[in-house]
């Protein structure tokens, strides 16, 4: 864990300016993976060169795929699924939950042996939700806690299609099963309890694969091949979220965000902001590769408390840390529930959000499935820690902009996982 400490101070004036947020992390991962599995050359622009997505590139290079990456441009020379070769060493996913879970789906259908590892945080995250259904499909997967924890050993091969009902909504699990189903005999169908982000389905379609959706059931026929496609990655709404919240709560602010992804399965934060009374406008909307994008402007707003629950949770699961910061600045009680999934992110985000914001004087309490925030009380300075979780780190930086006193943030290095230019962009608005 990066021990670097940064001293943060209250914003002296309103935030003002224009930011092009980095490429969407979810889409960047998938563009590289699908390009590596496809026949032909895939060109990716707008790629997020953060640590997580670079882990995906490294893993596929180890399986013999030629990938060139310079800044936000990536070229992948795919030779089809059969072009993937048995790796010589272990596949290290670093801190990336997306990489490991989707990779397990790919590896399950490949006729070779592989071992997947990650960092300490990955070593604590549950993998049985992916490995159990993949085993049902015929993959041989072993690991600590009977395949629940890394390192994981996968001996793939001919898998069979299944009909699987997911107990917990997870786009990563859904995607892993669809990628395994692509290689299986027959039609695999996955039913989710709540609709989750659908980047995998949209991008498979762009790569020439037929995926059908009926209600909350997604089906894929095995034996289809991917054809290379060029991918233009929109800006990541999860990264934009930090500046959307900052623009709302720092007095005298007006912030423009360009080229932000507006996929409805990810845009829950926009609905919450509108509901709460934010001065938010969205324009210049276009769609490329099945992914909508647009420009947005946010200014300081008088906001009302809000409730987040049920079907809305998967559409903003990664934005809850910064929405909790927003809630501390709104008079009244904000409630977040049905968000148990936060417990299995890079940290237990219920505990870390509540624990760290409480250190800054927030009136906030954890519940079994979320949190209750009684806002409107000024935040104070204090010592806080990202716990190696990029989204916690950035949320605490936004909190510091409103704190009456300096905030000392430990483990800032984690932020580079998804937003390497975060501090540079924040500085440009001040």
Curated annotation (Swiss-Prot):
Pfam families found in the cross-reference section: EPSP_synthase
Binding site for 3-phosphoshikimate: 25-26, 30, 170, 172, 318, 345
Domain of life per record: Bacteria
UniProt-annotated location(s): Cytoplasm
InterPro entries per record: Enolpyruvate_Tfrase_dom, Enolpyruvate_Tfrase_sf, EPSP_synthase, EPSP_synthase_CS, RNA3'P_cycl/enolpyr_Trfase_a/b
Annotated pathway: Metabolic intermediate biosynthesis; chorismate biosynthesis; chorismate from D-erythrose 4-phosphate and phosphoenolpyruvate: step 6/7
A GO molecular-function descriptor: 3-phosphoshikimate 1-carboxyvinyltransferase activity
Residue positions binding phosphoenolpyruvate: 25, 97, 125, 172, 349, 391
Any Gene Ontology CC annotation: cytoplasm
E.C. number: 2.5.1.19
Record field: catalytic activity: 3-phosphoshikimate + phosphoenolpyruvate = 5-O-(1-carboxyvinyl)-3-phosphoshikimate + phosphate
PROSITE patterns membership: EPSP_SYNTHASE_1, EPSP_SYNTHASE_2
Catalytic residues, chain numbering: 318
GO BP terms in the entry: amino acid biosynthetic process; aromatic amino acid family biosynthetic process; chorismate biosynthetic process
Protein keywords: Amino-acid biosynthesis, Aromatic amino acid biosynthesis, Cytoplasm, Transferase
Quaternary structure, from the entry: Monomer.
Function, in words: Catalyzes the transfer of the enolpyruvyl moiety of phosphoenolpyruvate (PEP) to the 5-hydroxyl of shikimate-3-phosphate (S3P) to produce enolpyruvyl shikimate-3-phosphate and inorganic phosphate.
Protein family (similarity comment): Belongs to the EPSP synthase family.
Record's protein name: 3-phosphoshikimate 1-carboxyvinyltransferase
Source species of the chain: Shouchella clausii (strain KSM-K16)
Gene name tied to this protein: aroA
């Amino acid at each position: 864990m990066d021990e670097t400490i940064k001293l943060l101070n209250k914003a002296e004036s309103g935030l003002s300016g224009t930011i092009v947020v980095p490429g969407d992390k979810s889409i960047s991962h998938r563009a590289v993976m699908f390009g590596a599995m496809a026949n032909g050359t895939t060109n990716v622009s707008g790629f997020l060169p953060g640590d997580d997505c670079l882990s995906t590139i490294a893993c596929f290079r180890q399986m013999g795929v030629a990938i060139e990456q310079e800044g936000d441009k990536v070229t992948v020379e795919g030779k089809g699924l059969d072009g993937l070769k048995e790796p010589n060493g272990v596949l290290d996913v670093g801190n990336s939950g997306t990489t490991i879970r989707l990779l397990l789906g790919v590896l399950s259908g490949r006729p070779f042996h592989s071992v997947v590892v990650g960092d300490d945080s990955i070593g604590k995250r549950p993998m049985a939700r992916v490995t159990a259904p993949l085993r049902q499909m015929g993959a041989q997967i072993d690991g600590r806690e009977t395949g629940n924890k890394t390192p994981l050993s996968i001996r793939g091969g001919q898998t069979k299609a299944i009909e699987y009902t997911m107990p917990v909504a997870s786009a990563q699990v859904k995607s892993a099963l669809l990628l395994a189903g692509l290689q299986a005999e027959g039609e695999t169908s996955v039913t989710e309890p709540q609709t989750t982000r659908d980047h995998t389905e949209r991008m498979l379609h762009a790569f020439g694969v037929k995926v059908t959706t009926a209600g909350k059931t997604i089906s894929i026929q095995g034996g289809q091949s991917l054809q290379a496609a060029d991918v233009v990655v929109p800006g990541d709404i999860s990264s934009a979220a930090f500046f959307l919240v900052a623009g709302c709560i720092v007095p005298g602010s007006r912030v423009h965000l360009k080229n932000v992804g507006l996929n409805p399965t990810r845009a829950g934060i926009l609905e919450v902001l509108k509901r709460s009374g934010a001065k938010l406008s969205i324009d210049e909307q276009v769609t490329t590769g099945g992914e909508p994008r647009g420009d947005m402007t946010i200014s300081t707003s008088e906001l009302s408390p809000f409730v987040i629950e049920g079907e809305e949770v998967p559409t903003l699961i990664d934005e809850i840390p910064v929405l909790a910061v927003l809630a501390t600045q709104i008079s009244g009680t904000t409630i977040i529930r049905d968000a148990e999934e936060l417990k299995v992110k890079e940290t237990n985000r219920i505990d870390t959000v509540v624990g760290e914001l409480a250190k800054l004087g927030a009136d906030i309490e954890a519940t079994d499935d979320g949190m209750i925030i009684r806002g409107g009380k000024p935040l104070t300075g204090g010592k806080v820690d990202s716990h190696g979780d990029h989204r916690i780190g950035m949320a605490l930086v936004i909190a510091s902009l409103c704190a009456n006193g300096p905030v000392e943030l430990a483990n800032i290095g984690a932020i580079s996982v998804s937003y390497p230019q975060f501090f540079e962009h924040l500085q440009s608005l001040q």
